[in-house]
Amino acid sequence: MTDLTAQAACLTRDHLDDPVIGELRNRFGPDAFTVQATRTGVPVVWVKREQLLEVGDFLKKLPKPYVMLFDLHGMDERLRTHRHGLPAADFSVFYHLISIDRNRDIMLKVALSENDMRLPTFTKLFPNANWYERETWEMFGMTFDGHPHLTRLLMPPTWTGHPLRKDYPARATEFDPFELTKAKQDLEMEALTFKPEDWGMKRSTENEDFMFLNLGPNHPSSHGAFRIILQLDGEEIVDCVPDIGYHHRGAEKMGERQSWHSYIPYTDRIEYLGGCVNEMPYVLAVEKLAGITVPDRVNVIRVMLSELFRINSHLLYISTFIQDVGAMTPVFFAFTDRQKIYDVVEAITGFRMHPAWFRIGGVAHDLPRGWDKLLRDFLDWMPKRLDSYEKAALRNTILIARSKGVAAYGAKEALDWGCTGAALRATGIDFDVRKARPYSGYENFDFEVPVGGGVSDCYTRVMLKVEELRQSLRILEQCLNNMPEGPFKADHPLTTPPPKERTLQHIETLITHFLQVSWGPVMPANESFQMIEATKGINSYYLTSDGSTMSYRTRIRTPSFAHLQQIPVAVRGSLVSDLIVHLGSIDFVMSDVDR
């Protein structure tokens, strides 16, 4: 075993000491499961398909229950070579559950053969499994028996094949040339026609004829290429069907064709307002695979850039929410403030919206001279501006009347639908990953987590974001005053790009540098996982390495996906005007939903 392999192996854990493993074995027997050792930081348990629902129900009813289905997706295992000790599987499905009371997770996995891809739907236990199962079916082909509406979600209705299978082409050049004939165009248009009967909706009752209205996919209040079909009785929303996927670019498939290093720019585009925030979970997950511990200076720099982008995103969210309610002026103020943030970001990284600046083992380069003055000027400017936003718009009686009590829900509903971020904290649940599960040194910062009073409505959600802005300014102040000295890269063989000085010794070091930069670093075969508190909720990367220069499987869990699935539950019985306010209060962009 090399030193590098030994360092990586020390991070691999089976979590047999986790109390939930004992609880499961006491209930189902010591031989009922296969526990997988990974670097996810989470117990990973392979469950028999026949026991899946029983195990899920058991976990949900424990004294300190696993109350949230955080993620659900699949993997094509057929080409995976490093599977020692795991159940035989052509495909697998994983279920990631969170216990808020324990502040712990568990991941259940089910092995499937290519000839039998059926398993029971999880929607009977967790309603938010609906969209996750639809996406897993269309990407891999697993059939979830009992699912209420197992149809395509991200891909067009006419699409054939399952794109995340290993035998499905990954590049446009592997397909035949695209041709849009008149017949194909007519077929695509017909496929987009909404048929209420397909969704269990009635066109009329004895006394009422319902109207069906398309909002989007090109509408300013839909905040992107997003379509929602409304079933209306007058102006009252009887039901609705969100239609997503117009922004889907195959981000997870791209992860299988890019090196660990060259995939970093793609992470910026997942939630395109978040910039470096998007890079954080990816590089942390890769560093777990590699066994890299970064210097303190790197941690603080990463936190500083993340909080700058958090403020930038929140400013746009707050101002566009106010605009959706009917006031235009704050948007122009917000863009002035965001320009100041971009000036700081550009001076540090060289780019503005999508810096692609974090690196495996560090950051691209050290902080430039004068960065502290730019940040100081911004910190002197921003608090007064926040006060003006609050005084001029957010305390406005019309805005309060339009948003308070609108699209309201409690803690149980938020957990049932996988809500995170301000949407969850507005219900009174104090769960911010920066505090609950600190990463990148957040445990060293002094800041508060704003929490609501028990009900998450449009007004509470936006006001929590205002207070989050103030807390981000506190964190930035501490970054400015306590920036550590030291290197901006870890001294580790898998740090990418490696330190340039090593290339100047002899031909061997030059070759090593060349291979790592051109082909990319080779990560140890294992699995890793990292969640962070992103701008819109919890974002996570679940990476599987098969000992190659590229990821075997890249799973990206975004908060906006879960939040849009919840829309029908939140707005049934509301007016169309209330829906517009609710869409503005969610804080989403479609790239974050569709990936």
Swiss-Prot record:
Catalytic reactions on record: a quinone + NADH + 5 H(+)(in) = a quinol + NAD(+) + 4 H(+)(out)
Please state what the protein is called.
NADH-quinone oxidoreductase subunit C/D
Tell me how this protein assembles. NDH-1 is composed of 13 different subunits. Subunits NuoB, CD, E, F, and G constitute the peripheral sector of the complex.
Function (record text)? NDH-1 shuttles electrons from NADH, via FMN and iron-sulfur (Fe-S) centers, to quinones in the respiratory chain. The immediate electron acceptor for the enzyme in this species is believed to be ubiquinone. Couples the redox reaction to proton translocation (for every two electrons transferred, four hydrogen ions are translocated across the cytoplasmic membrane), and thus conserves the redox energy in a proton gradient.
Q: Which NCBIfam families match?
A: NuoC_fam, NuoD, PRK06075.1, PRK11742.1
One MF term in the entry's GO annotations: NAD binding
Q: Which family does it belong to?
A: In the N-terminal section; belongs to the complex I 30 kDa subunit family. In the C-terminal section; belongs to the complex I 49 kDa subunit family.
Q: Which GO terms describe its cellular component?
A: NADH dehydrogenase complex; plasma membrane
Look up keyword Transport and say if it applies: yes
Enzyme class label: translocase
Keyword flag Cell membrane = yes
Classification via Pfam families: Complex1_30kDa, Complex1_49kDa
